[in-house]
């Protein structure tokens, strides 16, 4: 088996734990709801055959403890377990939970692995010594001796989709592996993907749901702040209502989280003399201002400019003539630091976390209430448990509703539901404030009511009426190259051979929304198949008739997760 470039490091070899001890009463801490869910899954598990189960439940409902019990059962049967996470950032806190639950350290597989440690892990996996392996998506391809259980945690997360160098969705590939090797796979989420719920409706998957929080704390109260009625001070982005509530939380020694899913200080810099917008030399995207490193940075290719003594390339004016538009996490930090000068504030984003150790320290400090205010990007939504956090404020709840992504409403609901779930996970009920310029939007309204199931029913009906995934199939063909003329010629060749098939629509070619990426020009076709045919065969037959152009790449993306 050829392994992809891997993601991981080896912790330690500890096979001293007796697998029967894992089932002793001291490990069984499930409440009645969890026990019923565990029993249902175990009946399917003991059939020793392929099955896909969705383990569903709101944040804090105890999904992890349920599948821990199944892992214990799997170990007692001398079989291996694989837990996939969408991001390695989840593993640090999670490793401790695994060690406490099972009494030994799991093997870990992620991007920091060295060749020597890679060999050790693969040896343990092949020999069967690796009882539990936690990994990012490429761990799926490891050659397990006797894999008996596969867990895909946060199965809805779009980062399971690898977008470059061999496009695949690790969640879907995990289901394929389980079906081939005949074992149980459990998909876990508080906000399942619409694809998974559709498969449940089609009787392909089994749905098991935990209805209540483990702690019995009420769900957080959600308040919508209509920003059209709010007059913000200059250079301010946080409403007075939200700031006043933060002040009350500070007085009670409770924590607040401000969420904005934009890295850096400002997403766009403009010369006020001539209107020039600073863009990447390799990509058709704006450079983002980062105060931390005094640079303008492209988030697609890493190209950067020093923001000290900048000169406009169009008119030659210097840095005192530039305006920053929009807000990122650093701009919110500046505002909150002015407003609450004595508060201990933590910035929680990939730019402000240097290593896994740094991440662990920040998570531990937040857990121990050593920070008063946390300002974070999507990284903060990833399964963390902070018992003192009782307020979440979303700076721009509408941000991801904009654009042409068919999954925009679904992704927005999932992200906001997950970040809302950080509030009130301890003994004190939580509050959530959503700053929105479109409070009448149905996605925002459903979130306020915490009516998740109603949102999913409506969203699936919209997809059915429009014949969009998951009801129908879509694929993208991206044609890219460094020479724009050659890319155009290749697209013309494809257009001349476009198949004419009933219930198959082919759109394009058209410039991709990100028309230049890492120095390559990009055009795309979109294939929309409505009747359940094998879309791969349609594309294969089409491309086989078209000669390849030297220097031009053709990339096929089945079920695209983004449309850039």
Predicted regions: what they are:
Residues 489, 537-538:
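Short conserved micro-motifs at the rims of enzyme active sites and ligand-binding pockets
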Residues 508-518, 554-564:
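Short proline/glycine- and acidic-rich turn/helix-capping motifs at secondary-structure junctions
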Residues 1-21:
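Interdomain "pre-motor" coupling segment immediately N-terminal to P-loop NTPase/helicase cores
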Residues 506, 539-542, 550-556:
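Structured alpha/beta or helical-core interaction and ligand-binding surfaces enriched in interleaved
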Residues 6-11, 51-56, 552:
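Short coil/turn segments at secondary-structure boundaries
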Residues 42:
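Short, locally clustered residues in the helix-turn-helix/winged-helix DNA-binding domain
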Residues 492, 506-508:
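Acidic, polar loop-rich interaction surfaces within structured domains
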Residues 19-31, 35, 39, 47-488, ...:
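Inter-lobe coupling/hinge segments of SF2-like helicase ATPases
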């Amino acid at each position: 088996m050829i392994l992809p470039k891997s993601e991981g490091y080896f912790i330690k070899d500890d096979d001293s734990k007796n697998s029967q001890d894992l089932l002793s009463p001291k490990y069984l801490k499930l409440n009645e709801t969890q026990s019923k869910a565990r029993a249902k899954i175990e009946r399917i598990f003991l059939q020793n055959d392929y099955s896909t189960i969705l383990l569903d439940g709101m944040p804090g409902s105890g999904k992890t403890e349920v599948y821990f019990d199944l892992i214990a059962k799997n170990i007692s049967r001398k079989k291996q377990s694989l837990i996939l996470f969408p991001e390695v950032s989840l593993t640090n806190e999670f490793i401790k939970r695994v060690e406490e639950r099972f009494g030994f350290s799991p093997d870990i597989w992620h991007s920091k692995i060295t060749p020597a440690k890679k060999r050790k892990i693969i040896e343990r996996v092949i020999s069967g010594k690796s009882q539990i392996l936690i990994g990012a998506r490429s761990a799926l391809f490891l050659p397990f001796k006797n894999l008996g259980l596969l867990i895909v945690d946060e199965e809805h997360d779009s980062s399971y989709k690898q977008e470059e160098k061999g496009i695949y969705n690790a969640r879907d590939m995990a289901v394929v592996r389980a079906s081939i090797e005949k074992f149980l796979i459990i998909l876990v989420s508080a906000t399942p993907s619409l694809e998974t719920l559709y498969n449940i409706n089609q009787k392909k998957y089994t749905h098991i749901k935990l209805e209540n929080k483990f702690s019995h704390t009420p769900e957080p109260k959600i308040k919508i702040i209509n920003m059209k009625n709010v007059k913000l001070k200059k250079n301010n982005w946080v409403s007075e209502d939200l700031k006043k509530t933060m002040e009350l939380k500070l007085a009670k020694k409770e924590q607040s989280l401000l969420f904005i899913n934009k890295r850096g200080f400002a997403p766009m810099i403009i010369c006020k003399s001539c209107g020039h917008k600073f863009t990447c030399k390799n990509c058709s995207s704006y450079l983002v201002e980062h105060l931390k490193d005094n640079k303008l940075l492209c988030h697609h290719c890493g190209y950067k400019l020093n923001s000290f003594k900048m000169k406009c390339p169009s008119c030659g004016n210097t840095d005192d003539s530039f305006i920053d538009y929009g807000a990122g996490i650093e701009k919110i930090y500046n505002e909150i630091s002015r407003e609450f000068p004595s508060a201990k504030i933590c910035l929680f984003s990939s730019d402000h976390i240097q290593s896994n150790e740094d991440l662990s320290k920040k998570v531990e400090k937040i857990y121990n209430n050593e920070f008063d205010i946390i300002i974070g990007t999507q990284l903060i939504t990833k399964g963390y448990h902070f018992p003192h956090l009782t307020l979440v404020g979303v700076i721009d709840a509408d941000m991801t509703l904009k654009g042409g992504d068919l999954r925009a409403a679904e992704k927005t609901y999932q992200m906001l539901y997950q970040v809302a779930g950080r509030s009130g996970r301890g003994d004190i009920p939580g509050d959530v404030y959503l700053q929105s310029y479109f409070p009448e939007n149905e996605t925002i309204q459903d979130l306020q009511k915490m009516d998740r199931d109603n949102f999913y029913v409506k969203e699936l009906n919209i997809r059915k009426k429009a014949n969009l995934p998951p009801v129908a199939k879509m694929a993208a063909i991206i044609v890219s190259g460094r020479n724009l003329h050659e890319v155009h010629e290749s697209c013309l060749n494809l257009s001349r051979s476009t198949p004419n098939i009933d219930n198959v629509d082919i759109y394009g070619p058209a410039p991709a929304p990100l028309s230049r990426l890492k120095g390559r020009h990009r055009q795309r076709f979109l294939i929309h198949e409505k009747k359940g045919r094998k879309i791969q065969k349609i594309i294969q037959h089409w491309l086989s008739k078209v000669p390849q152009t030297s220097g031009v790449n053709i990339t096929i993306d089945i079920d695209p997760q983004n449309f850039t």
